[in-house]
Swiss-Prot record:
Domain RNB: 211-529
GO CC term, one of those recorded: cytosol
Pfam families hit by this protein: OB_RNR_1st (PF22896), OB_RNR_2nd (PF24190), RNB (PF00773)
GO biological process per UniProt: mRNA catabolic process
Signal peptide: none
Catalyzed reaction equations: Exonucleolytic cleavage in the 3'- to 5'-direction to yield nucleoside 5'-phosphates
Subcellular location: Cytoplasm
Superkingdom to which the source organism belongs: Bacteria
Name used for this protein in its record: Ribonuclease R
Known EC number: 3.1.13.1
Lineage: Bacteria, Pseudomonadati, Campylobacterota, Epsilonproteobacteria, Campylobacterales
Length: 644
């Protein structure tokens, strides 16, 4: 059903028999038009799901993207989260409005809930909608009493019975499974999929013919220290001024339309938690046969990029043998001290390319923006509680890899531009609208950063970041700038990437963890190595595929965000009634305070007093909600000077 409804955004030649009543006499009749023998959703109509936040319902489109999720009006109260509905969208400056037209599918048969006692009865409270009426279960009260307090369960709504027990809400080790279940992420692979992965994992590089032997080139991978899936490797030949970028050739192990392919596409992306990963592909491939492990011959797609003439980049099917799997910290130590156990050829490659990468970055930032995201990395103990929080900062090693990957991705986009007339799988990023820009100007004004008259948006971003560095508030200003941006999206047509400053861009370098890259590999391989016979077929599915990927990208981000919010709420529970130094980040309906001691933990405070962003305050944590992942508190002291 969902696949058929998504296809209506792009046009279908024939309506399947089982869906004909919906179109001929049913709820879709007024929303569809016939255009050149194709049935297509009319302009202004949209199909999507419901996402509830507190007492409001928001519309999540199956295929379209809005700057903000539309607010649903006139929605009947009976509709559950994830029901599929037809809406008419009215765009406005602040937030689009979705007017409910009809229900297409209200068959949400399962729900995640937690057990609680209300009026001397144990009932199930919907996790995503804790404000709604509790659900009475068919189980006896005696049997429910045997379960842990606040037990988290999956409920079969038709039978009103528990179908799965996830565990006690108070147990931190439940958090991964809970976040995955809340957003319907499939955790396990089918037996067919695992068996097929195991079969392909046993194949050796020597089993594949007609590939260029690059095993003499000393490639290196550079990744986070806990990485196990190595997608990409680099080597810089200083004499030829040529960069080699090798990317795992995953498509050789994942046949199109196989169970492996279908299950990878359903997931779309690997989901990463601090201590684990839920991969897009089975471990025998993602951490085994496809991963570019040191001293193992591996299949790769290899770019040879002459840095004197980037347009002459050449893509080949090759066999490589990586010399070292290194962590960012290890490479940074070498770049700073010139001391390393790496071979001389690798040392020269890294030092030589660092010089080039810094120049490339400097040139790139004349048109693109350096989004300093200040990512917080959580370290968890064996009990699943936060042990340590580190802020990951930019480094020479990050610059090496980032610039190399950007070159490979741009080279791939050029192939799409030149051979498919700007069609394919692109990674795009729209410039913020005038309304979004104005909101950012207003927020930065509160931070005492004023936009000079007649200064354009892009120069102002650089100006704001420069002032923020002088004021030592770069983290806060970067956060505001990032929040003001549109999401980067996948598109079947070439559009520019505002953030990077590129006219054309795509994702090529992470096929182990992103289905977009795997699909792009198939398209480019068909073009370059298989007489382009299947290109038109692969191109035909890109509109629907890109829409799927955008939805799955959002889902993966929500899962990871939900997990982190709950971990911070657990941390706050350990410090109830304790006081901390913080800084005001926002001051609207709630005052939002970031804690200096626990970077990333935000405390919501309801107060009648007026506060300004960047005010230094002392707060007391009063409440932590594991359901909503919220921490609340009160301000106990106002400190006059700004945070340094």
């Amino acid at each position: 059903m969902q696949g058929f409804l998504r296809s209506l955004f792009f046009g279908v030649k024939k309506i399947p028999k089982r869906f004909a009543p919906l179109v001929e006499k049913g709820v879709l009749k007024e929303a569809l038009q016939s255009n050149k023998d194709r049935y297509l959703l009319k302009e202004g109509f949209d199909i999507g799901k419901i996402e509830r936040v507190k007492n409001k319902a928001f519309f999540i489109s199956l295929a379209k993207n809005y700057p903000k999720d539309p607010l649903i009006k006139n929605l009947p109260p009976s509709f559950k989260t994830d029901a599929l509905i037809l809406c008419q969208i009215e765009c406005s400056k602040k937030r689009p409005i979705a007017f409910f037209k009809a229900a297409l599918l209200n068959a949400d048969h399962a729900m995640i809930a937690y057990l609680a006692k209300e009026k001397n009865q144990i009932v199930a409270i919907p996790f995503k909608e804790p404000f709604k009426k509790p659900i009475s279960l068919k189980h006896s009260q005696r049997s429910l009493l045997e379960l842990p307090r606040h037990c988290v369960v999956k409920i079969d709504l038709k039978k009103r019975e528990i179908s799965e027990i996830l565990g006690a809400l108070e147990d931190p080790l439940i958090d991964e499974n809970l976040s995955l279940s809340l957003f319907d992420r499939i955790k396990d692979f089918s037996k067919d999929c695992l068996d097929l992965a195991q079969y392909y994992a046993q194949l050796k590089a020597s089993d594949f013919k007609d590939r260029i032997n690059y095993s003499h080139i000393p490639f290196i991978t550079i990744d986070p220290k806990d990485a196990k899936d190595f997608d990409d490797a680099i080597f810089y030949d200083k004499e030829k001024n040529t960069l080699f970028v090798a990317v795992a050739d995953v498509s050789e192990f994942v046949p199109k339309h196989s169970s492996l392919d279908k299950e990878a596409r359903i997931r779309g992306f690997s989901v990463y938690f601090p201590n684990s990963v839920y991969p897009m592909l089975p471990l025998s491939l993602s951490q085994g046969a496809c991963s570019l492990k040191a001293f193992e011959k591996r299949l790769a797609l290899v770019y040879e990029i002459p840095l004197d003439n980037l347009k002459n980049a050449r893509l080949s099917q090759g066999v490589i043998e990586v010399r070292a799997n290194c962590a960012y910290e290890e490479i940074n130590h070498f770049l700073n001290t010139q001391q390393s156990s790496l071979g001389k050829d690798l040392q020269q490659s890294l030092l030589g390319f660092l010089e080039v990468a810094l120049k490339l970055k400097k040139e790139r930032l004349k048109k693109g923006f350096n989004f300093n995201s200040f990512e917080n990395k959580l370290y968890l103990n064996e009990e699943g509680r936060i042990e340590k929080i580190e802020t990951e900062k930019e480094s020479g090693a990050h610059t090496l890899i980032e610039e190399a990957m950007l070159l490979a991705n741009q080279s791939s986009a050029r192939l799409l531009d030149g051979h498919f007339h700007n069609r394919g799988i692109y990674r795009t990023h729209k410039e913020p609208s005038l309304e979004q820009q104005k909101r950012l100007y207003d927020k930065l004004f509160d931070y005492e950063i004023v936009r000079p008259k007649n200064m354009g948006f892009f120069p102002f971003l650089e100006h704001a970041l420069k002032i923020s560095q002088e004021k030592s508030i770069e983290r806060e200003v970067s956060r505001l700038i990032i929040k003001s941006q549109n999401l980067a999206l996948y598109s079947p047509m070439q559009e520019s990437h505002f953030g990077l400053g590129f006219a054309s861009y795509t994702h090529f370098t992470s096929p182990i963890r992103r289905y977009s890259d795997l699909a792009l590999h198939r398209l480019l391989k068909e073009l370059l190595f298989h007489q382009a016979k299947g290109c038109s077929y692969l191109l035909e599915e890109t509109p629907e595929l890109c829409a799927e990927l955008n939805a799955l990208q959002k889902k993966a981000a929500l899962i990871e965000r939900d997990f982190i919010k709950r971990k911070f709420a657990r941390l706050a529970l350990e410090f109830l009634e304790k006081e901390f130094l913080g800084v005001v980040l926002e001051a609207k309906d709630w005052v939002v305070v970031g804690l200096k001691e626990f970077i990333g933990l935000k405390v919501l405070i309801k107060t009648n007093k007026v506060f300004k962003p960047l005010e230094k305050v002392r707060i007391k944590i009063t409440h932590a909600d594991l359901i909503l992942g919220q921490v609340r508190g009160e301000i106990t002291e106002r400190i006059k000077e700004h945070v340094s």
